[in-house]
Amino acid sequence: MVLVLVLLTSSKAFPQAAAPATVSVVGGAYHVRGDILISDQFNNRVIEVNPRTHQIVWTFGDGSSTAGPKSVVAPNDAQVVGPLTLIAGTGAPPGGEPSCPNGCADNRVMLVDVFGDILWQYGQAGVTGSGRNQLNTPVQATFLPNFDVLITDQGNQRVIEVTLWNDIVWQYGQTGMTGSGYNTLNNPNSAELLDNGNILIADENNNRVIEVNREHHIVWEYSNGISGAAFASRLKNGHTLITDSLNNRIIEVSKGGAIVWEYSTSSRPGSVTNPNPTRAVRLANGNTLISDQFNMQVIEVDRKGMIVFSQGQISVAGTGFNQLNAPYDAKVVGDFTGLTPP
C-alpha cells in the first residue's frame, strides 16, 4: 500500500518510459499521451495501442478465463493512474466465454504496474460477495483525487467509494436490492465524480442517468427515451454525454434535457443490427471516442459524425493485428475531458 502511494504521489506527469519486453508486445513506450487504453472484454485483456500504427505497446491479461495474478476476466473498464493502470475485472456473463458457458467470475478492481504485477486490489479473485473486500460484477472503477476508488459494483446494486486500505467510506444504493426510489439502483453501469462533489451514475436497467449528492438525493435526472444507460459523463459546457446502449446511440444532452448531438453506431456501413455501444468519451479535440462493443471496434468520430480513427475490424472478432473482441471501454491516455481526473 505504501508503495502504491509513493508511486502515485511521486508521479508528476504521465510517464513515457520504455515498457519491459516481458510485458510489451512490440516494445516502445508505455502510457504515452495520445495512446488508447482499451478494455478488450472477451479477449480477457487490457491493451494500450499506438493509434498511428495500431500496434499494441502494452497488455495485461494472459487470455485466461480464470481470474488470477496475471489474468483478468472480461474487463469492462481501465484507466491510467500515473505510472499504474486501474482495471475492473468484471467477469463474463453466461454465454460470453466459450470456456465457461455458465459465466466466469473475476470480481476484482486492481492497480497494476508496467510489469503486470498487481499492487493493490479490492475484491477476491473469482469470489462473488458483498462483504468486506468482496464485489459482484464490478463494471467500472474511477480513481479519485483523494486516492479513493469509486467502484460501480453492478451485481450488488451499488456504487461504493473505497480507500486504498479497503474501507468503504460512502455508498449509493442498497446492497443487493433493486429499485428506482430513494437510494436505490438497478444494474448500475458507471459512476463519475463531478466537480461539484456529486456523483453521476448510469443506472442501466432503470434507463436513466442520475446525478446524486452525498446525502443520497437525486439532483438531476435524464431518462427520456433511454434504453440501457451504459455510461455518462459531464462535459465542461454543462452538457451530459450518454451512451444509450440498447438504442445503439450516443447522445449529448443539455442541462434542460434537450438533445444537442447524436450519433448512431448501428447506422454506419458494415454494422451489426445491435452493436450495443458501451462507452463514449469526449476528447479534448472535440471528437468522441466510442467503444462500439459488438461491432468489435473502437471508433473516434467528429462532430459531423465522420469516423476519423478506428481500432479493430468491423464485425470481426479476433486477437490478431488490429482485432478486438467486444471492446467495452476505451480512453485516450492523458485526456480526461469530461472524466474524473485522478
At which residue positions do the language-model features occur?
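Bacterial N-terminal signal peptides
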Residues: M1-K12
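Histidine-/acidic-rich catalytic cores in large beta-rich domains
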Residues: Q16-P342
